[in-house]
Regions:
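Aromatic-rich, lipid-facing transmembrane alpha helices and their immediate juxtamembrane interface loops
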Residues: 1-388
């Protein structure tokens, strides 16, 4: 397949992600779904409520996923010996690590504290909070990786990550309309319409950088680095990829037609559609190393997103918990999840919802790669250095 045909195939597939849920929704509602176009998203109708059957099935899936991560040897993963690496002089933390600590502390305090100031500074804490956190994570990677991190070695990649992150999360906000707002933002009147678009655009720049910093941080630990890199070798045929691709198309349409039953497809459909499209076009994906038994990229980016998800939910919940429902954080979000909305631990996210982060991380990496392959820039986020 010629290069231009590969690029066109990826663009068409990415376009179908936007069109198929829309077509499904038009068939369902004979028009646009309730709440379509509201930004930020608002809750427009009550979800179906708790379902014991749906919840039980989800628990079974979650249990299997947990077993694979916690006990990989039960599923054919083998222990990989790694020769101890010689340790040189300790690498100090970079300057941006130290600068970011007070920024994070002040931002966190202002977000959670109930201070009556002349200017409502708590409105503007999300972006500095998260970018300082990203720089702290990068500083940890830098120290543990002998001075190698995204900021120190690939600053242009960090800039591109921020740009792609912004546009990719707008894509998820768009898809959210077709599952009738699985998440929504009750503090939508803190800013004007233009203010919401501007501020949320800045906020969305933090998603991909945070996930990839966590991924790189996990890789600096031998425990994670070798845990999933010697597993079952899975080679797939072109026929399988085509079937996998078609399955993604069907799920994307079904998400719009069955917004409650298939709400979870929002986090899953992009994986078969885009990863299969890239594989059919002979592009590298996080699944490519699996043919040699290396599952570490898929597993670690999932874990990285779960770890980061804890902070997303923790800081989000606390921003309203201490404020008696007063609107202080325009980025504050709540969930309206059908069938599974049980068991919250200092979080708006139901406990089972954290498993969705495993797939979300893969989605983010795949979208990043699609952008790189279409716009022809270096997508390699890996950095090398001596690890401990």
């Amino acid at each position: 397949m010629k290069t231009w045909k590969k690029t066109l195939f990826l663009i068409v597939t990415f376009g179908l992600i936007f069109l198929l849920p829309l077509f499904g929704s038009l068939a369902k509602w004979h028009g646009l779904p309730p709440g379509y176009g509201d930004f930020p998203a608002q809750k427009v109708e009550a979800d179906p409520g708790f379902s014991l059957l749906y919840f039980s099935l989800a628990c079974v899936v979650a249990l299997i996923i947990t077993l694979v991560f916690v006990f990989p040897r039960l599923f054919g993963f083998k222990k990989t010996p790694e020769a101890p690496r010689q340790k040189g002089a300790a690498t100090p933390f970079p300057v941006w690590f130290w600068w970011s600590l007070p920024v994070l502390a002040v931002s966190w305090f202002l977000m959670w504290a109930r201070l009556k100031l002349h200017v409502s500074l708590e409105y503007y804490t999300f972006v500095p909070l998260w970018w300082s956190f990203i720089l702290i994570l990068d500083g940890l990677v830098y120290k543990r990786n002998n001075g190698a991190s995204i900021i120190s070695r690939k600053p242009k990649v960090m800039q591109l990550l921020a740009v792609v992150s912004c546009f990719s999360w707008f894509a998820f906000e768009y898809l959210n309309f077709f599952v009738l707002e699985n998440w929504y933002y009750p503090n939508n009147e803190v800013f004007s319409n233009f203010g919401n678009v501007f501020w949320f655009s800045l906020s969305y720049t933090t998603v991909l950088p945070a996930i990839f910093e966590w991924y790189l941080l996990l890789k600096t630990f031998r425990f994670f680095r070798t845990r999933y890199n010697n597993g079952p070798k899975l080679k797939v045929s072109g026929v399988f990829l085509i079937i996998y691709y078609i399955l993604g198309l069907i799920l994307a349409f079904g998400m719009g037609y069955y917004p409650y039953l298939l709400f979870w497809v929002l986090w899953v459909a992009l994986v078969p559609m885009l990863s299969a499209a890239m594989a059919l076009a002979d592009y590298w994906t996080p699944f490519t190393p699996i043919k040699n038994g290396d599952w570490s990229k898929v597993m670690l980016v999932g874990l990285a997103t779960v770890f980061n998800g804890f902070f997303w939910e923790f800081w989000n919940f606390g921003s309203e918990w201490f404020h008696d429902d007063a609107p202080t954080n325009p980025n504050y979000w709540k969930y309206s999840v059908p069938y599974l909305d049980k068991f919250h631990i200092f979080s708006e996210m139901p406990l089972l919802g954290y498993f969705g982060y495993l797939f979300f991380g893969l989605n983010c990496w795949i979208i990043w790669l699609i952008a790189a392959y279409v716009f022809k820039f270096d997508a390699d986020i890996e950095v090398t250095g001596e690890q401990s």
